[in-house]
Amino acid sequence: MVDGMSDMGTTELGAASTPEQARAAFRDGLVRPTCGIAQGYAQANLMILPKEQAFDFLLFAQRNHKPCPLLEVMEPGVTAPVTAPGADIRTDVPLYRVWKRGELVAEVPDIREYWRSDLVTFVIGCSFTFEFPLMEAGVPVRHITAGRNVPMYDTSIECRSAGAFHSTMVVSMRGIPSTQVADACRISGYYPSVHGAPVCVGDPSAIGIDDIMHPDYGDAPVLEPGDVPVFWACGVTPQAAVMASKPEFAITHAPGHMFITSKRDLEYMV
């Protein structure tokens, strides 16, 4: 499980920070989750694979748009994403995960030593993008106000397989006051490129979650009296696919430690 956000108070990064400031801080070695940073800009998950396995994953993402909404697919060996001019995909994420044959072998803040000319990067939308619009509408996002990472869970929801890749869906959860659940569904639904509307509202057991207080990734949830658990498809699903499908080599972001793009969130609003 990824560590929580105990160091969030040690940095000046916050809602008013620019994507460039955040990426520079991560490039310099700052490690912390990215929720609550760079208001108004889209955040993204990463999946990096050898070219020989990239088509299968591209097909997997297209068949499973809800958890894997593609914002950009980079050419083999390219490290400068179109979604963030001036960025380096190898250094500008606070924490990466390195996988070999489905096993996690390292968590590092810089992947230059692992980089290869055949690696293809997939930039995948993240629900952190619509958290600021939720808060602007008066819907509380409790893990941000508590200084925690968002809780994420493995589920029983089957993804559609593609080539070598198969998985169940991973979801993120936010406790929403019962009177504001409809607002949360409506607002997040405006952002289909960053997971869109929830996949489940209410009973966690309906999607195979036994105990919401013990997430598989991220931090334990913050739930207030009257809150309803609301679950969104999550871009950690590709990591579940890596563990299930066991590709020879892969690199991902660490859950909650996203790539902050230079794209405005409004560009992904419908």
From Swiss-Prot:
Keywords: Lyase. GO terms for molecular function: lyase activity. InterPro entries: D-Glu_cyclase (IPR009906), Putative_hydro-lyase (IPR038021), UPF0317 (IPR016938). It is an enzyme of class 4 (lyase). Disulfide bonds: none annotated. Its EC number is 4.2.1.-. The keyword Disulfide bond does not apply. The keyword Manganese does not apply. Belongs to the D-glutamate cyclase family. This is Putative hydro-lyase BAD_0077. It comes from Bifidobacterium adolescentis (strain ATCC 15703 / DSM 20083 / NCTC 11814 / E194a). The lineage of its organism: Bacteria, Bacillati, Actinomycetota, Actinomycetes, Bifidobacteriales.
